[in-house]
Amino acid sequence: MEQTRKAAAGVTNPRYANGTLRRRNRARLRAMGGPCGICGGRLGPIHYDEPSDAAHPLSFVVDEIRPVARWRQFGYDSPRAAAEDFNNLQAAHYFCNQRKGAKTQM
């Protein structure tokens, strides 16, 4: 019910406001095949072919270097601008990203 009210009020998750760009950025990071931007690969390589969930802690997720939740603090015009800025994105392990939360560093 709460989700319905938020959607009706026009409040959406900025990460998914432009799904095409989000998928393109995700594919670009996947193609780059880099190490985890959070741990630097200390936990091992990112498993790019596994589902991104708790059962696969080394799986690939897109991490926002500067958290979207703190967009004003980092000088973005909107949460959507922070979520869509490729320079604000990095590949990460699912585990590392969950541990980092809305912080800029671990």
Regions found by a protein language model. Name each.
Residues 8, 102-105:
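Residue-level detector of intrinsically disordered/flexible regions characterized by low predicted structural confidence
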Residues 45-46, 99-103:
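Short, non-ligating residues that shape and space the ligands of small metal-coordination modules
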